[in-house]
Amino acid sequence: MAIKYGRPIELREVSRRDGAAASPALDLAIRPRRNRKAEWARRMVRENVLTTDDLIWPLFLIDGNNKREQIASMPGVERLSVDQAVREAERAMKLTIPCIALFPYTDPSLRDEEGSEACNPNNLVCQAVRAIKKEFPEIGVLCDVALDPFTSHGHDGLIADGAILNDETVAVLVRQALVQAEAGCDIIAPSDMMDGRVAAIREGLDQAGLIDVQIMAYAAKYASAFYGPFRDAIGSAKTLTGDKRTYQMDSANTDEALREVELDISEGADMVMVKPGMPYLDVVRRVKDTFAMPTFAYQVSGEYAMIAAAAGNGWLDGDRAMMESLLAFKRAGADGVLSYFAPKAAEKLRTQG
């Protein structure tokens, strides 16, 4: 007899297919484990699948030629000179990764209070876009729109009397987006979190005849502790004064995220993003369920660094943790993921067939 919720359940004798001795079994009509009994069976009923089409690969740029610099806080990630970024774009294409994202490390000598270098049509990002699109016009290129890689204070906007100026910053962001789009960028991705910037950028692009350039809005970007290694990578970690809580979102809020997403969609965003990723999967799900818009998540530098560091110390299976974390985004409703794991995950997917 077996006991279930205090009541006895009869066990019956069943014969095994291999002729072995009979064993007692519960009289169950439903056995979920039957669908998990073999890999082929698990594949047949799998609800979510990760493919290389789901990946966007962020690359960090640095001035110079034939340069690759390791980023200490992001094991396995490097800053790349433009020629090396072109090589990685070729690698992305061979791995069938559809899109790369570009982020610059700006020399301190080029940083100023206004982030002027952001609007230089020959800045590092624009150089890289032109070089990549010349060699590989069929790969998608996404460019970040924000001033923090270019300002001496490390903030995403202009500052006056200790406050971030919203409308004045938006005017600069429009100019930044235009030089990127004119260089050949396919997707403009404003990450600054200034109010009204999506509408202003859309208007600026359309007036310049760049109507086919897409906008992926960082619609729900939280003031997060998980950005630390990224700020190291772009050189703003040591320059940042204060925090970004007056423009990035409070990590306690999800209704606010929906309002932000709705605003960006109404202003002309073609796609929306939630950042960071794994700590905010609930937000990804709510956004996708509410708006049914192309929804992306950014597996940010801190998320990457945690897994990479733990794997490097032998504390977990790095490949399994990588793939599990990426699949979690798909399960939560994301249409794609920006991840520093993109090339490694693509290699893994290729070997899996």
UniProtKB/Swiss-Prot annotation:
Protein role: Catalyzes an early step in the biosynthesis of tetrapyrroles. Binds two molecules of 5-aminolevulinate per subunit, each at a distinct site, and catalyzes their condensation to form porphobilinogen. Required for nodule development.
GO annotations of cellular component type: cytosol
Source species taxonomy: Bacteria, Pseudomonadati, Pseudomonadota, Alphaproteobacteria, Hyphomicrobiales
EC number: 4.2.1.24
Superkingdom per UniProt: Bacteria
InterPro entries xref list: ALAD, ALAD_AS, Aldolase_TIM
Catalytic residues (UniProt): 221, 275
Pfam families assigned: ALAD
GO molecular function, one term: porphobilinogen synthase activity
Oligomer status and interactors: Homooctamer.
Pathway it works in: Porphyrin-containing compound metabolism; protoporphyrin-IX biosynthesis; coproporphyrinogen-III from 5-aminolevulinate: step 1/4
Key words, A-Z: Heme biosynthesis, Lyase, Magnesium, Metal-binding, Porphyrin biosynthesis
Residues holding 5-aminolevulinate 2: 301, 340
Annotated source species: Bradyrhizobium diazoefficiens (strain JCM 10833 / BCRC 13528 / IAM 13628 / NBRC 14792 / USDA 110)
Annotated family: Belongs to the ALAD family.
Protein name: Delta-aminolevulinic acid dehydratase
UniProt xrefs under PANTHER family: DELTA-AMINOLEVULINIC ACID DEHYDRATASE (PTHR11458:SF0)
Binding positions (5-aminolevulinate 1): 231, 244
Gene coding for it: hemB
Catalytic activity, as annotated: 2 5-aminolevulinate = porphobilinogen + 2 H2O + H(+)
GO biological process, any: protoporphyrinogen IX biosynthetic process
Co-factor(s): Mg(2+)
Binding site for Mg(2+): 260
